[in-house]
């Protein structure tokens, strides 16, 4: 793998991880408000 491919893979994985983290955080906030 070239450096560019590795960087692209890390970037895409990072975006997915950040998006998942934000989704979980929002669900926790909404759940706390409902209770």
Swiss-Prot record:
Pfam families: PetM (PF08041). Keywords: Electron transport, Membrane, Photosynthesis, Thylakoid, Transmembrane, Transmembrane helix, Transport. It is found in: Cellular thylakoid membrane. GO terms for molecular function: electron transfer activity. The 4 large subunits of the cytochrome b6-f complex are cytochrome b6, subunit IV (17 kDa polypeptide, PetD), cytochrome f and the Rieske protein, while the 4 small subunits are PetG, PetL, PetM and PetN. The complex functions as a dimer. It comes from Mastigocladus laminosus (Fischerella sp.). GO terms for biological process: photosynthesis. The keyword Calcium does not apply. This is Cytochrome b6-f complex subunit 7. Component of the cytochrome b6-f complex, which mediates electron transfer between photosystem II (PSII) and photosystem I (PSI), cyclic electron flow around PSI, and state transitions. Belongs to the PetM family. The keyword Transport applies. One of its GO terms (cellular component) is plasma membrane-derived thylakoid membrane. Signal peptide: none annotated. It is a single-pass membrane protein. The chain crosses the membrane at residues 6-26.
């Amino acid at each position: 793998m070239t450096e560019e491919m590795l960087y692209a893979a890390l970037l895409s994985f990072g975006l997915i991880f950040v998006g998942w983290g934000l989704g979980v955080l929002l669900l926790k906030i909404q759940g706390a408000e409902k209770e």
